[in-house]
Amino acid sequence: MKALDEPPYLTVGTDVSAKYRGAFCEAKIKTAKRLVKVKVTFRHDSSTVEVQDDHIKGPLKVGAIVEVKNLDGAYQEAVINKLTDASWYTVVFDDGDEKTLRRSSLCLKGERHFAESETLDQLPLTNPEHFGTPVIGKKTNRGRRSNHIPEEESSSSSSDEDEDDRKQIDELLGKVVCVDYISLDKKKALWFPALVVCPDCSDEIAVKKDNILVRSFKDGKFTSVPRKDVHEITSDTAPKPDAVLKQAFEQALEFHKSRTIPANWKTELKEDSSSSEAEEEEEEEDDEKEKEDNSSEEEEEIEPFPEERENFLQQLYKFMEDRGTPINKRPVLGYRNLNLFKLFRLVHKLGGFDNIESGAVWKQVYQDLGIPVLNSAAGYNVKCAYKKYLYGFEEYCRSANIEFQMALPEKVVNKQCKECENVKEIKVKEENETEIKEIKMEEERNIIPREEKPIEDEIERKENIKPSLGSKKNLLESIPTHSDQEKEVNIKKPEDNENLDDKDDDTTRVDESLNIKVEAEEEKAKSGDETNKEEDEDDEEAEEEEEEEEEEEDEDDDDNNEEEEFECYPPGMKVQVRYGRGKNQKMYEASIKDSDVEGGEVLYLVHYCGWNVRYDEWIKADKIVRPADKNVPKIKHRKKIKNKLDKEKDKDEKYSPKNCKLRRLSKPPFQTNPSPEMVSKLDLTDAKNSDTAHIKSIEITSILNGLQASESSAEDSEQEDERGAQDMDNNGKEESKIDHLTNNRNDLISKEEQNSSSLLEENKVHADLVISKPVSKSPERLRKDIEVLSEDTDYEEDEVTKKRKDVKKDTTDKSSKPQIKRGKRRYCNTEECLKTGSPGKKEEKAKNKESLCMENSSNSSSDEDEEETKAKMTPTKKYNGLEEKRKSLRTTGFYSGFSEVAEKRIKLLNNSDERLQNSRAKDRKDVWSSIQGQWPKKTLKELFSDSDTEAAASPPHPAPEEGVAEESLQTVAEEESCSPSVELEKPPPVNVDSKPIEEKTVEVNDRKAEFPSSGSNSVLNTPPTTPESPSSVTVTEGSRQQSSVTVSEPLAPNQEEVRSIKSETDSTIEVDSVAGELQDLQSEGNSSPAGFDASVSSSSSNQPEPEHPEKACTGQKRVKDAQGGGSSSKKQKRSHKATVVNNKKKGKGTNSSDSEELSAGESITKSQPVKSVSTGMKSHSTKSPARTQSPGKCGKNGDKDPDLKEPSNRLPKVYKWSFQMSDLENMTSAERITILQEKLQEIRKHYLSLKSEVASIDRRRKRLKKKERESAATSSSSSSPSSSSITAAVMLTLAEPSMSSASQNGMSVECR
């Protein structure tokens, strides 16, 4: 406020403090546009007008008597009530800045920059906390304090004066007074009776200082009159009314006696009089009046216990004052006065503040208060108001056992005067007290049931309709946990001693889960519920939403898992939210802070990013458009119908660190490796979970292949659709498959026992290799192979036993599940492609896995062996132990890969197992020498160090110097490939933590992919993120194909041709044929549908390249391999590696010519060779395991591939979409149709993925070239040939400029 001597306006040149960016800075007035508004009261008639200062003669000072120019030009005497400086001042700051400001932004220099009125003491305490209620200056009485300085400046009354003023008004409030005024002609002094009311009662009339607001009994109008002209009247002191005022005077006396409001007031302001007569709460009541003018709702309510309300408020205000938090100003909420007593009762009715957890309930409280909901924060605001004003009091009342009459106000249409109301209310109170209490009790009881009843009714209805669903679900639920426990138990058992037991358990588990699976599949068939596919889920969700909700509620009531029944976005997730209505609707990014379920609706508490937290609000789920991250699938907010499978998945997702692709919310997966036992279990359960398992296994395989295809999310969804279609097709077939499974299970058990005994005798490592291939072979043959192999191997018992288990399971699975596999086979083809097609998630997984692998693999092989033994010793460390084991397997796989390359060559050429053993050491040396011959020592050294650093910057693995160690490594690698394939094939049992299994299988595959990371295959190490990794993947496929070739010995010539042709031109053909063959093998019982699918898809591009150079050689070798028998898988691996080396040597010379020849012969050989290959493969179903192993080979083939690719630069023609006729012939017409449709879909996706991959491949090629140059510059010789040398070679080959983007395309295609 201005000091009294402060001028009414400022002149140019005055030094001032002017507001600049919120702070007062020194400035000088440069120009002034003067405009002073003066409010004056004419002395003759007490009328008030506002004029400008140029119409006034006399000093411009509040209280001064001046002459004011009338409209007619005559001057009349008046008193200045108020001065307002509305001038515009342009000020210049010290630094030359200029700003035009109002007087309110200036103050005279030397004065305190903050006027007294601006201190916190002067501010109304409640204003800052009036959540959602901005400070509005329309109410003059309140506004006077919070108004701008100009008005306060010009009204020079101090705060003390203000308070005195208020006191006077308060004294007169609600009193009947006589107001004196002078008639216009100044001849007569007149008066009228009036009632003093609160200044807030009329928005239109501004009540000035020293004036009060009255309502005339004469005409019912509000008038602002000077305080000095008002005299209180009583029946004794009243002046004598004239005839005109007689009625008004009578009304005034009537009111004075009985508080009866004049009839003519009722329509306008019913509450005015009633509030004014309640003198104890005059101001509060008047405030209410003003609010209630605006809202008819409050007027209509009858307070059942007015005395109780006063008692309540009295105690509340006293409590708050004693507590040090007095309520100085009437609480306001949503522009209305807040009825604290009503709020207290409403909350009490709901069980108190602490019992109300939902924002929606608070919102209802807000509405029950009769306050219109202005914004979405209403519930939050009323909660805050309660917490501020009433929460402490509520607790105090509870502790002190203070109780109030809690009946809520009733709504009434016509209101009479307050006294009548009071009389009636007393009667009502007496009559209805008991009723009210009963009603209250019932209401409290019904609040919750009200929400629950409709749901329960629906639930009952639906349960009657579908009684079977619930029971099925329960069954499904019970089993998964059981199987989980069994798994854990099995893992913990000593692996050697309890092999057989484990297998028996597995088979029994298979039975159980098969039954479950059957039920689940029937259910799915009915409901169309493909829970594994997000899109299908969404469609199905629409149909089954209600049903799911109800069933979930029942189940969840039993489980006390109410929150879990709804699928919600997790806290912290960013989403796009619709805000506003109609044209004003906008999309904001918000993060979810909390979620809640209200009456069957999901509500989210969201924080709008970049906005103050005061804008946080609870919104309905339908306001959320989609997650901000477009890769995250949108959640349909409904209760999930938890199929056995879904529930398992959910649990696993919750407890496992990784969310797989099936998970709604995609998070980079963190995989743990399943132990061999787990793998075998997976094998057994494979068939059961054909639905979920197929998908999972496919995902896993794609991960295995390190599919780095960068495809659009659209492709993802397409793939999901395809998957959904496949699943639908398979649903029908799965039952038959299951029957086969059960029939085969007995065979499996017996076979397993035989195998286990023989395997125990033999070296388990080799047994693994042999077994994985030789399902088709007779047990004796297997034993022979095993014996041959066993001569070579020195292995840790633990590893051997694990491998043994894997191998046994592989073989048994293969033999026992031909049909199941066929079904899977189809899945695998399409699904592989599909999975590979969804690069985003898979890439993430692959990357994670690879990083893990790199770190782990970089450890020396001896370390890894130790780790393996440790892991075995501590079986309880399921995940860690498994991972360690896998790591060791990986590294061993690399080594074994090395030795295997040479060994394979020898075995293939000589076709004798013994020779293979004898020449292993030589072969290893050969491999190394060939690699070293190709690459300068410096580059090799550098590359090794590079790959090692890539593999977690750990020292390169020791070279395969120790034959025994290498052999064990080989076996390990093979085992690994087998086990992964096994795992891949085994879709996790429906109930048995499908997710953990998924994770494990994924990890296994990843590890396979990672094998290279240990150093042997830089292709895998580096490329997992790049399409080139697919090349390695393709290589694996190639190896698998090779294995298939080996299978068919008679077909050898054709196959060679086919292979060379395919490898050069149709890597895709080979892949497809391989896939088909794999399928056939699977149908015959081969164990890794997924495994091989992955390899198939990957091999198409990579393999062709490696095989070109060695067309004939590799083909013959493969044929010999097949003849080689049990060790064929090893041989295959080795042959791949050998081919890598050879390709490196020959590749540059032969590739171009080969590719030309192949392209020429291609079309012819394509169909025949494919068929022959597939048939051969069928005959030797054993070989599929080799394919499965291909992940291990993957890297090696990858090595070959790069070299071949560099020299040949040929575009692999993509006949990926061709397939073996033999496959088609074995299928029913429906199957054929679905497969063809899937192929078409894949082609479409493939085209899209190729487009994106071409670009990424170019980028990667450049990067690799750069790396190659750098490595050449810093080359150093490698101390010993280690697996990393291969990696280096692979890297170089990948990096070589000669590699055409087309060949890379092929790789990426295969990766798909």
UniProtKB/Swiss-Prot annotation:
Chain positions of cross-link Glycyl lysine isopeptide (Lys-Gly) (interchain with G-Cter in SUMO2): 429, 440, 462, 517, 751
Tissue distribution: Highly expressed in the testis and in breast, lung, colon, pancreatic and ovarian cancers. Expressed at low levels in the thymus, prostate and ovary.
Record flagged with keyword ATP-binding: no
Pfam families (alphabetical): ARID, RBB1NT, Tudor-knot
Coiled coil regions, renumbered to chain: 728-754, 1231-1270
InterPro entries: ARID/SWI1_ChromRemod (IPR051232), ARID4A/B_PWWP (IPR012603), ARID4B_ARID/BRIGHT (IPR028853), ARID_dom (IPR001606), ARID_dom_sf (IPR036431), Chromo-like_dom_sf (IPR016197), Tudor (IPR002999), Tudor-knot (IPR025995)
Classification via PROSITE patterns: ARID
Compositionally biased intervals (Acidic residues): 277-305, 532-567, 788-799
Ranges of biased composition (kind: Basic residues): 1130-1148
Gene Ontology biological process terms from the UniProt entry: establishment of Sertoli cell barrier; genomic imprinting; negative regulation of cell migration; negative regulation of stem cell population maintenance; negative regulation of transcription by RNA polymerase II; negative regulation of transforming growth factor beta receptor signaling pathway; positive regulation of stem cell population maintenance; positive regulation of transcription by RNA polymerase II
Stretches with biased composition (Basic and acidic residues): 483-496, 643-656, 722-754, 778-787, 807-816, 828-852, 909-927, 995-1010, 1056-1065, 1196-1208
Residues that bear Phosphoserine: 276, 295-296, 483, 666, 675, 717, 778, 790, 1014, 1029, 1152-1153, 1155, 1159
Region (Disordered) residue spans: 124-166, 266-306, 458-577, 635-680, 708-894, 909-1212, 1252-1288
Subcellular localization, as worded in the UniProt entry: Nucleus; Cytoplasm
Organism domain of life: Eukaryota
GO function term, MF aspect, one: transcription cis-regulatory region binding
Compositionally biased residues, Low complexity: 1028-1037, 1087-1101, 1272-1288
Keyword Secreted carried by entry: no
Entry remark concerning the domains of this protein: The C-terminus mediates interaction with mSin3A corepressor complex.
UniProt-recorded name of the protein: AT-rich interactive domain-containing protein 4B
Organism in which the protein naturally occurs: Homo sapiens
